[in-house]
Structures are given as structure tokens and as C-alpha cells.
């Protein structure tokens, strides 16, 4: 079937013509080869005619000689503005900057480095500058040198901050030279001085010393906001030794100025300033007496008595050393509260170790110094100050004693029983080592009560007080003392005053309550009265009383950690259960019961913290023991663990 338009026939005709042409060309080639004497190719050629033709053409071209020379390419200028130079010389492009030869002296650049060479006073002279001073304008950022502007007296008067100066490197004048040149510069009054004075004077005082290269990384003086104390804070400066080529730290004094220098500067009215510097450099010589051996000054004790909640935060952060009657703050922990200098003083290498105050309840309370002996006069002063300071607090919260007769009787009882009196205990025992193996939040406190009727010792009553939450109890004394002082005698006496006064107050209140029931049967047992029942009368032998007193004296705690003192009252049917004396310690002994006597009650009061962290929960458990016939019946409440109250009737 033919294609459309007869295209198939045309293709066939072309193929036939090509075959015929190849045939005739082949015949011509053979005839030529025969004429040239070339061997005729094989009848069955494996190479196509195209390749054969290329081979022939290549042979013909190789026979020809290449006599023509290569032509050099001509440069075509794309930008017609430029002209091709005809002469051989350096080209000057119009876009290049103007060439100016540099006149900088690279050898003098090392003088502008902040690490300057330090010369002695004999070698001080002007530093060689560059020949062309205009070149320093390009490098003014690296020329931070000590330069005192001409407006230095004005800045001293106006109390302005020092502005950063970048100028030609040269040696600034010393303070002595500056004062002699400007005799009327800087008049001060009332001991108040600007910041720029000390910073500039200290910057140029001992800057140039022999055989050292100083690199002051951070040495600005900062003044605190308090203008009364006049404390100045300083940071350490890094000193680079030229011989050993190593950095070492050097403790500089707060004011690198000598006393004669200060007197020369302020000859007219500089007495106040010299006295001020003496107070700063030697702060404790005016506060502490000669016979005072404490590590804490009187000003610190007065501050602590006024601001008791800040005791714990203050003493945990700072430690104190005693070096040649100079109060020095340790360099690692430089925190101060009152008029102490916060910084580093020039202290010799062999310094005494720090004695930090021990404020953790979980640690072992050990005295830092041996206990001092106190005579009878100091103990009497201790008692009088105790009664004067703490008696008003107990009377305002619990009421006054009914009559002067009861007060005199209580005082006589306190004298007859020195075992239970806090003031008669030697203070050496209070300083002894105490091992506090209880939790930090719970302080076991305990007292041994004496039955006021017949002198029978009651069972031991143990109270667990939570030191942080005990302020929300029923009858809490809001006078927190939250730290343990082990080396200051004044603080120890103050704490003992509080303990003794609270002991006496609790005993007075217990006596007042029991006086309503049976005042005529009360005996001479004042110090540890805790529980009195109006319908209970017990008898005991004198041997039992002596044994109980001996056990109490032996088991009394040898050391004392003052915590928050709590007096808890619980009255049911004219019976008051009080936690009279809150002495921290561990005492679990009970006096043996002889004859037909019986235990009255055991009360365990535990203050625990709620899950909501709002207020403590009181958990009381009372265990009544062998009831006696003919005794009265009274209702008591036993608090369960869950906080539910269940009325119970116990016959005693």
C-alpha cells in the first residue's frame, strides 16, 4: 500500500540511486588503485566507505607542507576610553587612591600599649613619642594612658564621675606633684569625699615602681550608697612580674595612700579625712576595748539584738579573723552588715584560720575557743539583766502574779533548788561540744516536771518543736533566735538570759494556775512545775526524790543550742499542762516509782507541717496509766493522727 502522496516510491528511488552511485565510485577507485600500483582491497571490506574516504583525505593532507606562518592575535579594546600606551612605563589607573608615603614609626608603637614599662622615681621622664604626632590620631583607641585633665580641681569640687580620656601617652603627675602645683584644689567638709578623688589618687600613687610591669585589669573603687559608714569597696588588681613572667595576685589596701600624704594634701582642714582613713584601715581599734577577746564587736551585737531575723543570713555568709587587733573580713567571703569594711586589707601570708559561726542544726556545735570562767559578779549581772529584759514579755502575755507573797515564795524555791535553775549552771557546760543528731526542722526539747502536791517526779515530757513553724502555736513567744553562737560571750549571755527568763515565766504561770485549786498544798518545787491535778495527791519517799534529782542533774544537756522558745498551755477543768523550760537536749530517763504510786500522764506534743505549708498541726497523745479508786474524773481530748478530736473519760 503506497503512502499518501507517493512518498514511499520517492524514498525507494533515492536508495537505488545511492547504491548505483556507490557502485560507480567503487569502480573508479579500483581503477585508480590499479594505476597507482596499490594492492586492491579485500573483496569483503569490513570498513564503510566513509571511513575509507577519511583515511584517503588524511593521507593526502599529510603530504602537503605547511608553509604558512601563524598570525598574532590583535588586542581588541572593549573600552574605547583607554588608549593603548605607545611607550613602556608604569600605568597609573585613574581609580587608584592618591599615594602618600607613610611616616609612621612602628618602633614607637609599643609605648602606647596599656602594659607600660614602670620606672622608678629617678628614671621618670617623658616618653618618646613619634616624630609625626598626627599619626596618633588614627590610633587613638590604643592610647589609653594615665592622663589627668586640667579640670581635675573642678571635678573634685563638683563630685562628678571621671570620663574616659584618650590622648597622647605620657606619664601623669603623682599626687604630691599635683598638690604642690595646685595648692588650693579640693576643699572638703563633713568627711564626705567624691568618688573621683580616691580613684585618681590611687591610680597615680604607686603606679611607677621598679622592675615590675603593672596591668590593672579591674581596679576601680566603688563607694557604697551609705554615706554614714563611709565604706569603700575595692577589687583586686593583677600584678605581672617582669622576672618570672607570671601573674600573681596582690592584696592592695582599700586606700593606697599614706598618712603623711593625706596630711600634705589636706593641710588646712584635713584632720577629719585623716581620722576617717584611720577608721577605715583600722576599724576595730575604736570599737573594741583592750580586754575584749570576742570575735564580734559591740556594734555587731547591738545590731543583732535589734535585727534578730537577719542573724542567720549574716553569719552564714561572713567569717571573721583576728589579726593584731584588726577586724579583717576574709577575702573569699567578703560580706558585711554594719560598719565593717568590705574588701581586702593588706594581710600577711601567715594568717590565722577563719572561725565561721556555726548556724546549722545538723552540724556538730563545737566551741572555737576555750571557755572562759565567769565569777559570781558576772552571773549576778546575768540574772539581773535577764529579769529586766524578759519579765515584761511574760507578764504581758500570761498575766501577772496574784500577790507579792507568791512571788517571794517562788524566788525562795528557786534558791533552794539550784539543780533546776539555769543561772547556777556553770557556763563552761554551755560551751561544751553538742552533737545534734536530729533533723534540722525538728528540735527535741524536754523537761522533767515535779508534782507540786507531794514532791513526786512526773514522767518525762518530750516536745518536738519545728524551728521554722513554731511561731504559730497557741502561746508562742514571738522572739526568734535562729542561730547558734559558739565564740561570743555576749551573745551566749544574752541567749542564756532568754532561756532563764522563759523558764521562770513558765514556772510562775504554772504556779498561778495550780494556786486556784490547792494553793495551801504547794511545796517548794518551783523550777519544773508542769502538771497539777486538783483532785490528785501522791506520796513518795525521800529516796525517790533524791534519785530523780540526781538523774536530772546527770542528764542535763552539756551544751545548749538556742532555738525558738515556745510555751504551750492546755487547760481542761482547771488543769494546765505547760511546757515550761525549753532546753534543747536529749533526755529520756524517768524517775523510778516506788510504793503504791502511779504515773499521772504522759503527753507528747509534736508540731508537724501540713501539706498545704500554711500552719503546723498539733498532734497530742495522752496515755493515762493505772487509775486509783476514789479519784476524780475529768474529760480530756486525745488528738488522733488525722486531726480528729475524740473525748475520753479518764479516772485518775
Curated annotation (Swiss-Prot):
Main location (coarse class): nucleus
Location of the protein in the cell: Chromosome
Tissue-by-tissue expression: Expressed mainly in testis (at protein level). Expressed in spermatogonia and enriched in spermatocytes; absent in testicular somatic cells (at protein level). No expression or low levels in other tissues.
GO molecular function, one term: DNA binding
Compositionally biased residues, Polar residues: 478-491, 639-652
A GO cellular component annotation in the UniProt record: chromosome
GO biological process: meiotic cell cycle
Biased composition (Low complexity): 467-477
The protein's role, per its UniProt record: Involved in recombination, probably acting by stabilizing recombination intermediates during meiotic crossover formation. Required for normal germline development and fertility. Required for meiotic progression, complete chromosomal synapsis and crossover formation. Binds double-stranded DNA. However, also binds branched DNA molecules, such as those containing a D-loop or Holliday junction structure. Probably not required for formation of DNA double-strand breaks (DSBs).
Domain notes: The N-terminal region (residues 1-228) binds branched DNA molecules, such as those containing a D-loop. A truncated N-terminal region (residues 1-78), binds very poorly to similar DNA molecules.
Subunit annotation: Interacts with MSH5. Interacts with TEX11.
Name of this chain's protein: Regulator of DNA class I crossover intermediates 1
Organism the protein comes from: Mus musculus (Mouse)
Gene name per UniProt: Redic1
